[in-house]
Amino acid sequence: MKKNFLLAFATIFLLTSCGNDDNENNQNAIKPIVGTWKMSKIMMISGSNNAILRSSPVSGCEALNTFEFGQNQSFSIKYYTKNNMECIADGFDTGTYQYSENSKMLTFTYSDSMVESSVVHSLNSIEMMTVDHIEDYNDDGVNDTSVILFKKQQ
């Protein structure tokens, strides 16, 4: 589950600051990500020939997973799983995030000190799309592209 989360968000933000002006700019840069998000669509695209290997809406218990980003650069993820025909909470992750508007890198530092990054392809006040190349989905020896579309919850 962390993989899907990072795929989607690693592309978003890596906040660094060198002075007061940079800090102000960083605070403005993270505002679109602040809030609660849910995955709405996942696509896998072949790294060999750009064919779409999978394109599907997020459904079932996975559609209930929430990704919350705070203004203080904290994040929390709540996961759900199916148990006896109903979705139940199945754990959570917390930590801090940083975003670089220039590189579009979103870096997560989990509370267990694990660090992961993802690339944010696009971000506005209602949608975020992350792109990553970390796995060989179709076992052809070439890493494929994972694209995850998130919708901001109101």
Predicted regions span which residues?
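Positively charged n-region of N-terminal signal peptides that target proteins for export
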Residues: 1-4, 19
